[in-house]
A protein has these predicted regions:
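Acidic/aromatic/glycine-rich contiguous surface patches that form carbohydrate-binding/processing clefts
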Residues: 216
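Extended intrinsically disordered or low-complexity regions, especially N/C-terminal cytosolic tails and loops
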Residues: 1-208, 220-301
Length: 301
């Protein structure tokens, strides 16, 4: 076990940060532009994009010919990648929310989400209700205020009002814990997925990705903690999953592309991702789990 020690590093001024990078062998062509950039993007955030250029991970000395502008390009790529992913997730989230509310409410009534008899796990049911209650209490939406002025029972507004406020994570947990497997499968089939377990897996992974994008976290070479289920065969155009690292960006990008294909929006997402990768020659797609001939896979053609 390593020995804990006192943290002694002090804050550095921007000029000191620049001198530190230069002393480690980083080529900085324009110190004034570098200072402006580091005044807008913190050194601690940006250093993650410098790591691939390091020759020594202990001394943090850079490889020969390492350039500040290449790390900036990687940072900009990552920002555009997050934007692309987040916009796609928003479309998926709204569609999924619509399908769940519509199908479940038609089958089990407008208040199905707080019917304990429809839950697999009572403890998770209570957790979900507490989350929904907190989200409702925080809400400033006019439609909730109007509902409260006119109705006092049941305790929650109907699903199509309440679940418009629920986070994607809460919505996903409601779906996971819903006991009507036949109905869950019906929702999954509307996204061209064979079983609800596959949809549940993708929802979990998309929730992690969504949080990463929403908090502006590094994405490009990230190891995503929750891997989507990469089924060997799906009804639509798919990919060869052999050797695919399900915890990398490529895997979840495949799931998003397939999901969007089922809704008729996949081509736009795929073209934008291809264009983004082509625009940044400095970026190594293999660091994101992209196989060598990924663009030839049926899903991406």
């Amino acid at each position: 076990m390593s020995t804990l020690r006192l943290y002694t590093k002090q804050a550095l001024s921007i000029s000191e940060q620049i001198e530190l990078l230069k002393s480690r062998g980083l080529n900085i062509a324009d110190s004034s532009k570098t200072a402006k950039f580091l005044g807008e993007v913190s050194y601690f955030r940006f250093v993650q994009y410098l790591r691939p250029m390091e020759a020594d991970k202990t001394s943090h000395q850079f490889k020969p010919n390492s350039r500040f502008e290449d790390a900036v390009a990687l940072y900009n790529f990552d920002m555009e990648l997050r934007d692309l992913m987040f916009k796609a997730i928003q479309r998926l989230e709204i569609a999924l929310r619509t399908k769940i509310i519509q199908e479940f409410s038609l089958e089990h009534g407008p208040f199905w989400f707080f019917d304990t008899s429809l839950a697999d796990d009572e403890h998770k049911f209570i957790e979900n209700m507490n989350s929904i209650d907190r989200e409702l209490q925080r809400s400033k939406e006019d439609f909730i205020k109007k509902h409260r002025r006119n109705y006092d029972k049941p305790i929650f507004p109907p699903a199509w009002k309440t679940l418009e406020l629920a986070s994607f994570g809460t919505l996903s947990k409601l779906y996971y814990n819903f006991c009507d497997k036949k109905l869950k499968k019906r929702v999954a089939r509307q996204f061209n997925l064979p079983q609800h377990e596959v949809l549940e897996s993708w929802m979990r992974s998309v929730t992690v990705l969504r949080n990463c994008c929403a908090h502006h976290s590094r994405l490009w070479n990230r190891y995503l903690s929750t891997a989507p289920q990469m089924s060997a065969s799906l009804r639509g155009a798919w990919v060869n999953i052999e050797g695919v690292d399900a915890n990398k960006v490529y895997a979840i990008a495949c799931c998003i592309a397939y999901w969007l294909d089922s809704m008729g929006y996949g081509l736009d997402f795929k073209n934008k991702l291809k264009s983004l990768l082509a625009s940044y020659s400095q970026v190594d797609p293999t660091a994101m789990g992209f196989p060598e001939n990924w663009i030839s896979e049926p899903l991406w053609r």
